[in-house]
Amino acid sequence: MNNKSSRRKFISTAVILTAGSTTMAETLSMKTKNNKIAHQVYFWLKNPEDRQKLIEGVNTLKKIKTVRQIHVGIVAGTEKREVIDTSWGVSLLLFFDDIAGEASYQTDPIHLDFVKNYSNLWNKVVIYDAEMV
């Protein structure tokens, strides 16, 4: 095998490997962008007596088209442990098909109305967004 032939073989192998790794990287990138999203919200109430009113408001969010699942909760009566935060009043867990679905939720009129009509009930809100892996 001469140098010219070896060089051609090397170049064609390099091209094939590069194309393969690029395709694999694109596939992984696309997979990451399309993973389901969990949107976890914790509300600290100004007045504990307003808990049911906030729960009613939170439940209006299930009408948003991009919401796939909704779970509303209150502090569980589980064993008290140092690592468990029981200072919040109402929790909300929403699932979306992807980041675009969660972004659409943020600007949906139902969500905007919820914030406008119920934000006076809480003095603190903390949100955790997680991408499913």
Where are these regions (language model features)?
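C-terminal segment of N-terminal export signals and the immediately downstream linker at the start
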Residues: 24-52
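Residues at or immediately preceding the N-termini of alpha-helices
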Residues: 7, 48-51, 99
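N-terminal secretory signal peptides and thylakoid transit peptides that target proteins
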Residues: 1-18
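Short amphipathic alpha-helical segments
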Residues: 48-75, 109-119
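Short, well-ordered beta-strand segments in beta-rich or mixed alpha/beta enzyme
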Residues: 35-44, 81-106
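Short, glycine- and small/hydrophobic-rich beta-strand elements in well-ordered beta-sheets
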Residues: 25-30, 62-88, 120, 127-132
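Surface-exposed, polar helix/loop patches in the mature regions of secreted/periplasmic/lumenal proteins
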Residues: 94-133
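A compositional/biophysical signature of low hydrophobicity enriched in polar/charged and small residues
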Residues: 16-19, 25-27
